[in-house]
């Protein structure tokens, strides 16, 4: 595989910056906010910083499954997927797609670091009021790594939907 050295270096730098910011924010929360407590509230209760842990995945799904299965589904499989995403990002020529892939990769790495080194689970701390949308008064608490993954997926999907080759008529 012919890898563009500049692309590799720029990807690694960008990933490192995003992962550092995610881990630094989690470090601050773990250091200064007692687990299970609210630290700050902005605009009434629209946005809160609260320290919680998540031993599952999105919306705490899988929190109650056996720990050996958690290692398989929440560590091993995601690491394999991230290796493929990284190799794909190196081959991707489109800057928007590469940006989206790097966001997804950075978020995945940030949460895998928590799974490996934080026995209480992934640190979540961003809490947003959701005004009853989808039956939720508050969106499930999340972190910057989660945001990277979601924004990366949205960018990737929107870009893919609106830049498909329009010359193909079905």
From Swiss-Prot:
GO terms for cellular component: plasma membrane. It is a multi-pass membrane protein. GO terms for biological process: proteolysis. Keywords: Aspartyl protease, Cell inner membrane, Cell membrane, Hydrolase, Membrane, Protease, Transmembrane, Transmembrane helix. GO terms for molecular function: aspartic-type endopeptidase activity. Its main location: membrane. It is found in: Cell inner membrane. It catalyses: Release of signal peptides from bacterial membrane prolipoproteins. Hydrolyzes -Xaa-Yaa-Zaa-|-(S,diacylglyceryl)Cys-, in which Xaa is hydrophobic (preferably Leu), and Yaa (Ala or Ser) and Zaa (Gly or Ala) have small, neutral side chains. The active site is at 124, 146. It comes from the Bacteria. Belongs to the peptidase A8 family. This protein specifically catalyzes the removal of signal peptides from prolipoproteins. This is Lipoprotein signal peptidase. It comes from Borrelia duttonii (strain Ly).
